[in-house]
């Protein structure tokens, strides 16, 4: 992973988000071409955002921000569908969780209702904190030991 290299990469991430989330957003009746991209433009980049690379090329993104009470918030975690199913996202998530555990920080994230990603997060100890008709807000408590499924 590496830092963001300017506005063109932010636009690339905005397009990636729209492609990755379109099916779920349409299913929920929430897809809007402009809005799907604007949130990334408004909040991706800076010191907390990263571009995920494979073979020296960008394949995904994530942002890990300081959150309330010393915790962390995981946002903009998208992986190009052509690179999904290869363990890249799992390795990135494991790295984020290991760092969070080392800091003694819980991790929060939001996933769309019905998203396949929810299963991955649940395997890594995230539980539902709150939800509405569109979003499921999840949290993972600090764990001692490994960040893999089931903990130490």
State the predicted function of each range.
Residues 57-66, 73-78:
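Conserved beta-strand in the GNAT
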Residues 41-51, 58-60:
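A short helix-loop-beta-strand connector motif used in the catalytic cores of GNAT acetyltransferases and
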Residues 71, 100-112:
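Conserved GNAT acetyl-CoA-binding A-motif
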Residues 67, 84, 108-118, 131-143:
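Conserved beta-strand-loop-alpha-helix junction that forms the acyl-donor binding cleft
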Residues 21-43:
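Conserved GNAT-fold acetyl-CoA-binding loop/helix
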Residues 85-98, 119-123:
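Conserved acetyl-CoA-binding loop-helix of GNAT-fold acetyltransferases
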Residues 1-15:
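A short beta-loop-alpha structural element at the N-terminal edge
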Residues 40, 121, 126:
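Conserved active-site tyrosine of GNAT-family acetyltransferases
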């Amino acid at each position: 992973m590496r830092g963001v290299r300017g506005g063109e990469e932010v636009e690339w991430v905005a397009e990636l988000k729209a492609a990755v989330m379109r099916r779920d957003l349409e299913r929920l009746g929430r897809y809007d071409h402009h809005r799907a991209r604007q949130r990334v433009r408004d909040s991706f980049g800076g010191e907390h955002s990263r571009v995920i690379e494979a073979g020296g090329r960008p394949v995904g993104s994530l942002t890990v921000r300081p959150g309330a009470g010393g915790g962390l918030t995981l946002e903009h975690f998208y992986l190009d569908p052509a690179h999904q199913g290869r363990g890249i996202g799992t390795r990135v998530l494991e790295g984020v969780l290991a760092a969070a555990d080392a800091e003694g920080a819980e991790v929060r994230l939001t996933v769309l209702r019905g998203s396949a990603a929810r299963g991955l997060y649940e395997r890594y100890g995230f539980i539902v904190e709150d939800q509405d008709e569109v979003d499921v807000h999840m949290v993972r408590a600090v764990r001692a030991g490994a960040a893999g499924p089931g903990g130490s």
